[in-house]
Design a protein with these regions (language model features):
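Short glycine-/acidic-enriched loop or helix-start segments at secondary-structure transitions
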Residues: 1-3, 73-74, 108
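Conserved N-proximal alpha/beta basic substrate-recognition cap immediately N-terminal to
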Residues: 1-46, 50-53
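Acidic/polar active-site rim loop that often engages polyanionic ligands
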Residues: 10-11, 31-37, 65-69, 134-139
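Short, charged, surface-exposed secondary-structure boundary motifs
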Residues: 20-27, 72-74, 132-134
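A short linear hydrophobic-aromatic micro-motif
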Residues: 41, 61-63, 94-99
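Short amphipathic alpha-helix with an adjacent loop that forms part of the alpha/beta core around
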Residues: 52-57, 89
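Conserved anion/nucleotide-ligand pocket segment
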Residues: 60-81
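Internal nucleotide-binding/catalytic subdomain
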Residues: 78-168
Length: 168
């Protein structure tokens, strides 16, 4: 889609020069950091030694997933050095990102904004089951919309929309 928007100079939506910021997880983190939104610490997977050095900083478990893409496909939780060595012994031929594992509940912030990036509608969803568990364990996905958006989530969500500089 971005290529078509670029080729035909369509200014709604992202063109090629900005698509990497939402296509690659490692690049997304730069946008979050720009406006002070916290993310899990990460390391682009290179070799076993550097992976173990990163794990020495953040501890076990860690999560590894393709840097490019969405969802939880080909995502793994590595719980110990044996898991890490097995992963590195058979790394798929794509760039992976390794992140510290953060235990918690997934809540989303979704906002629709106008051409000035002012929010015109916002909502939040609560996901009782971790998405990685839903995919890896083939669980049913379910979530519900929250009546109220917590102030800290609303603030982080609004800052994120401004940071990503999306087009209407």
């Amino acid at each position: 889609d971005a290529q078509l928007r670029t080729d035909f100079n369509i200014t709604t939506g992202l063109q090629n020069d900005r698509i990497d910021g939402i296509k690659y997880k490692s690049r997304m983190k730069e946008f979050y950091a720009k406006d002070g939104v916290k993310t899990a610490r990460h390391h682009l997977v290179t070799n076993l030694e550097e992976g173990l050095a990163f794990i020495a900083q953040v501890g076990y478990p860690v999560v590894v997933k393709p840097d490019n893409g969405v969802g939880a496909a080909a995502t793994y939780k590595l719980k110990n050095e044996e898991d890490v060595k097995a992963f590195y012994a058979d790394i798929p031929p794509v760039q992976y990102i390794m992140e510290e594992f953060i235990n918690g509940t997934i809540v989303s912030y979704d906002g629709i904004c106008d051409s000035n990036r002012d929010i015109i509608f916002e909502t939040s969803h609560y996901f009782p089951d971790p998405v990685m568990d839903v995919v890896n364990d083939q669980l049913d996905l379910w979530y519900y919309s929250r009546k109220e958006i917590p102030a800290d989530l609303k603030d982080a969500g609004r800052r994120t929309i401004k940071a990503f500089a999306s087009n209407s």
